[in-house]
Amino acid sequence: MEEIFQFFKRDPERRKHKKEFLASLNVQARALQRPFGFIAVVAWIHFGFNLDPRLHPEFPELFYFRIALTAAGVFVLTASFFERLRGKGLGLLYLLAVFSFLSCSFFTGRIADDAGYVSGLQILVITTTAVPFALRTLFVFYAISIFLFIAAIQIYQPALNTDAAIYSMNNLVLSYAVGFVLAWILDRYRFTMLINQFRL
């Protein structure tokens, strides 16, 4: 039992190297601004102009969610070429997370009975762990995401009593659980790599 507590016990070096760790996350984030910005520009264009109108004509507002991410991607991609605009690094990635992960959480909640769209949210839940966010920040994004998803379900009442919908919801819950574990592992790995640099 003591070994288990030691495994989850917070490393005292965390507090000592908090600023250095955040600085290292910002450095990693700066390297991802351009590729993530480009991906954001093109990721949802086909959905917005082609698939969404055919699959969910009752939800025309979905187009604006898609275009908002494209606009955010254009801004991030452009800003990444200007030193004054790109900031320390994480700021622009926070912007992309809001327009992709959080907006997807809300509009997927509205059409949560569509397993295809729920699977798209599952992809974002997992891939967001690869972004060099601080663990606490990522958990905040997860909490907001879950809140927005549930709020949209309560507001729009999609039919979730079918076997397909229940199966899809189970997979979504699992994706959040896996995301939490992956985020924790990656956070420990990033911090360990930083400490190893100090010890070299």
Residue ranges and their predicted role:
Residues 1-28, 39-44, 55-57, 93-95, ...:
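Non-catalytic regulatory/interaction regions at protein termini and inter-domain linkers
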Residues 26-42, 58-67, 132-143, 164-172:
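Alpha-helical transmembrane segments and their helix-membrane boundary motifs
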Residues 35-128, 145-147:
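Hydrophobic transmembrane alpha-helices and their membrane-interface boundaries in multi-pass
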Residues 54-55, 59, 85, 156-160, ...:
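Membrane-interfacial segments
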Residues 149-172:
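Interfacial aromatic-anchored transmembrane helix boundaries in multi-pass membrane proteins
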Residues 173-200:
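Juxtamembrane or sensor-core-proximal signal-transducing alpha helices
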